[in-house]
Amino acid sequence: MSLPFSQDERDLAAGGILTIDLAALRHNYSAIATRIAPTRTAAVVKADAYGLGASRVAPAFYEAGCRDFFVAHLGEAVALKPFLKPDATLYVLNGLQPGTEAACAREGILPVLNSLEQVENWAALATRLGKKLPALLQFDTGMSRLGLSAKEFDRLLENVTLLSRIDIKFAISHLANGDEPGNAANARQLAKMTALLARLPKLPAALANSGGTFLGKTYYFDLARPGIALYGIDPERQHDFSDKVAHENKKPKHSILPVLTLSARVIQVRDVDKGATVGYGGTYVANGPMRIATIAVGYADGLFRSLSNKGAAFFGDTRLPIIGRVSMDSITLDVTSLPEGTLKLGSLVELIGPHQRLEDVARDCDTIPYEILTALGNRYARVYVYVNGGGTSTTA
């Protein structure tokens, strides 16, 4: 009889280790919640908490005082519900597909109603059940993505019976440029939101996303729903594509802590001669004798092909450039600068951490941190720790 594949063996077999600091997540939530109080602070945990594991991340936010959690799809909410206590409320940002209304009501999950059709479907269920059903109502104030249009809002206000069937908890909208403090579009959206709320007196409202929580009190309203800031990304830095030195020397304006580190295992170290080509297509040619190392992660693990001949890993303080094309399951590094024997089979190199933040990797990929974070995938060994808060680490 064969022995089961143990968790330790799974971790050792993985191509890399993704370490997630739950204490830093709690700190980031508390820092935002304290600063914008008495406005309530929700947590956006869609896409499996931005790829970090909603079943572990959401309870950490709950421990920090969060009671409002936003996901994108009803299935995400149903999956997360068992990991939260009964006084937590789950909201579905994309609203409901036809035929899912009864399941949503049965589970006690609140939909964000984004169109007149969704409002009508939710109200119809309320009529069948003989009771008002709670929901959030979203308005489009300038993003042209989700939410009732001005014409739909006019039609809704004319239908008193329809409105009477729904217990609207919040009127919400979403800022398209909240991470750009100087963008005039923010003020235009705020003005539209204020005008809409004037027609719905005393209704609580929510507008601010991560960036919006740094725009000033007029954007806070009654509930804010930060996302990326909770996961360690300063919303004002994420689009900084300046040179690396300037980027690293720019101190964050806000007390947001990084929440993850990512390391990868070495699977081979070898010496190559001048003229040797590296990787698919031979896009890198050795300009002299050099030592190279292959690590066991690739674009299937969120390290995009755009890092080819461009990005880097670190071993201690030593930068190890990526050479050749990034493959699906492997990346090759120039490790000539390290003494011979420093790296060997199983050694770990840093991909995201104190020497290279998530924003730096995103910049090298010509993308945003959201895309890297949500693409990291499930092939890493995941370790959840309480670094900033002390205590012991636990392995997922």
Curated annotation (Swiss-Prot):
Pfam family, one: Ala_racemase_C
Record's GO cellular component terms: cytosol
Pathway the protein takes part in: Amino-acid biosynthesis; D-alanine biosynthesis; D-alanine from L-alanine: step 1/1
Domain of life assignment: Bacteria
E.C. no: 5.1.1.1
EC supergroup of this enzyme: isomerase
One GO term (biological process): D-alanine biosynthetic process
Swiss-Prot/TrEMBL catalytic activity: L-alanine = D-alanine
Protein function: Catalyzes the interconversion of L-alanine and D-alanine. May also act on other amino acids.
Protein name: Alanine racemase
Organism of origin: Brucella canis (strain ATCC 23365 / NCTC 10854 / RM-666)
Gene name tied to this protein: alr
